[in-house]
Amino acid sequence: MRQMDKSAIIDTLQEQGGFITTGEVKSRGEYEQLRRAAEAGTVMRLRKGIYAECSALANNMIDVERIVPHGILCLYSAFAYYGLSTQVPSATCVAIEAKRKVRLPDYPPIDLYYWKKENLEFGIISRNISGYDVRITDIERTVCDAVKYRNKIGLDVCGEVIDSYLKKEDRNISLLHEYALSLIHI
């Protein structure tokens, strides 16, 4: 019976893309199955109310919206997504509003960047990455962020991002200029 319980909760997790919240659990019995699966190590508790199937965590992309609601992939994670840098991010880079407080799980590693609300209102798009709907800075905004945070990320990374962007055929220099002006005034 216990093996069947574990299998049922794993099936539910797989249907949900590897992640589940206690709010999505339909009954006390399912909650107990989830708790037992976490105790057995089949499922990992990321933080209070959020669980993930261990194999889902092996993927290099995470369901950012579940772990950091309203978070936006940025900087190194965006550089990697757009192929602007050869740097491999050691953690998922997520921007949130400066006044927010977020409790992060031990795993997966996430670096939070606290941005002013005005910074979160432009240059943000939604993409389906590895099966997850993720909000991410668009490519022009990503390049502007590289320049803005050049002292934090390093001039070598900033230069690599700019060079890679300028080699792209689909670049939009006028949008890049518009974003640069917006970031100057924030």
Task: Name what the model sees in each region.
Residues 1-73:
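Short beta-edge/loop segments at beta->alpha junctions of small alpha/beta modules
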Residues 38, 56, 66-69, 101, ...:
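Extended, low-hydrophobicity, polar/charged segments
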Residues 57-59, 70-71, 85, 99-101, ...:
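Short, charged/polar surface micro-motifs in flexible loops or helix N-caps
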Residues 75-98, 102:
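Ordered, amphipathic secondary-structure segments that act as subunit-interaction surfaces
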Residues 86-89, 153-155, 171-172:
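Short, structured loop/turn "capping" segments at alpha-beta junctions
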Residues 92-162:
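Conserved, surface-exposed functional patches that form binding/active-site neighborhoods
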Residues 184-186:
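Conserved small/polar residues in nucleotide/adenosyl-binding loops
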